[in-house]
């Protein structure tokens, strides 16, 4: 049986555990601040955690992990995939956590120490396109979740995944397809009479975003298949889940969308509103959307992709 510490970390997402042991007043980089303290605040934190655990399980199932294998988690973040993988490769296995955030790697190391599993983990600080601290043909599986959307050169990342895999090694990943929502209205609501104000808010939102965020919108599921095929992966499979839903939402849902960025590289909608509109205009803009939310239902669009495959023996 795996050590009790692994079971404790494999059941909930790591973030629910790290929030309790990470110093809240520590100066953190934007990635760790968002993953450990911002993302799960508000009324939908528990729902988000449950959603991420479902993703984790699907990614790990499709990686086909076995006891004794070595696994690389690229963009390991708060350790959601890594600690789940550790449970599956016990005994004798090893999980390598790779992230660009030293703060997140330190948080995961602290949790591993608390759980008594630090000997089964290693940490490296590399970009997904340059895994230079991971030797050629050294791991049995590469896993990743919501990482490639931040990477401009996705083909280079796929080539690095291929390089570090042993013959017969596997890849398994999850990515949101953000381009699927480009044609939808903000909040899923037609701006109607506040369309001129909404246009200014959208312009301000785009101006506040770093240039790198374009990487989130310039690919779809076909691009994922292409770059991994070109990198030398075989037996590739991809599952696309797309939905358009019209549901009644609460004002708490609307406030969460206003105040919490969906990733650490973009501003909040409230910041964009403040940058674009006068206080009176902002009040008019928000009052319109609040009435629309209260009247419901609201249309939401989402698309996500799971990709998995292997390299030749």
Positions of predicted regions on the chain:
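Conserved class I S-adenosyl-L-methionine
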Residues: 16-69, 80-88, 103-107, 111, 172-201
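C-terminal helical/coil "lid" or tail adjacent to the Rossmann-like core of SAM-dependent
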Residues: 23-27, 31-43, 47, 235-297
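Class I SAM-dependent methyltransferase SAM/SAH-binding core
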Residues: 70-74, 78-131
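A short acidic, Gly/Pro-enriched loop at the edge of an enzyme's catalytic core
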Residues: 132-141
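A short SAM/SAH-binding and catalytic strip from SAM-dependent methyltransferases
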Residues: 140-154, 177
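A short glycine-rich, Lys/Arg-flanked "PGG" loop and its adjoining helix->strand segment in the class I
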Residues: 155-170
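Short alpha-helix
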Residues: 216-231
């Amino acid at each position: 049986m795996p050590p009790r510490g692994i079971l404790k970390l494999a059941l909930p997402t790591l973030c629910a555990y790290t929030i309790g042991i990470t110093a809240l007043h520590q100066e953190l980089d934007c990635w760790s601040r968002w993953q450990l303290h911002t993302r799960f605040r508000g009324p939908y934190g528990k729902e988000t955690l449950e959603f991420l655990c479902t993703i984790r399980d699907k990614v790990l199932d499709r990686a086909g992990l076995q006891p004794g294998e070595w696994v690389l988690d690229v963009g390991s973040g708060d350790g959601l995939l890594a600690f789940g993988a550790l449970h599956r490769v016990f005994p004798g296995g090893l999980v390598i956590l790779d992230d660009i955030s030293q703060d997140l790697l330190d948080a995961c190391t602290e949790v591993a120490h608390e759980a008594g599993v630090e000997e089964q983990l290693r940490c490296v600080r590399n970009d997904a396109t340059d895994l230079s601290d991971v030797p050629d043909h050294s791991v049995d599986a590469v896993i990743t979740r919501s990482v490639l959307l931040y990477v401009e050169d996705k083909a280079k990342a796929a080539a690095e995944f291929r390089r570090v895999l042993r013959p017969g090694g596997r890849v398994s990943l999850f990515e949101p397809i953000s381009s699927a929502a480009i044609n939808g209205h903000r909040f899923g609501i037609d701006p109607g009479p506040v369309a001129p104000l909404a246009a200014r808010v959208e312009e301000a939102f785009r101006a506040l975003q770093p240039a790198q965020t374009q990487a989130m919108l310039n690919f779809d599921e076909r691009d994922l298949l292409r770059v991994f095929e070109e990198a030398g992966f075989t037996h590739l499979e991809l599952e696309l889940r797309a939905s358009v839903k019209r549901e009644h939402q609460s004002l708490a849902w609307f406030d969460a969308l206003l105040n919490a960025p969906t990733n650490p590289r973009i501003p909040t909608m409230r910041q964009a509103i403040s940058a674009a509109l006068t206080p009176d205009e902002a009040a008019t803009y928000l009052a319109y959307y609040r009435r629309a939310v209260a009247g419901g239902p609201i249309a939401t669009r989402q698309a996500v992709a799971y990709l998995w495959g292997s390299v030749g023996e």
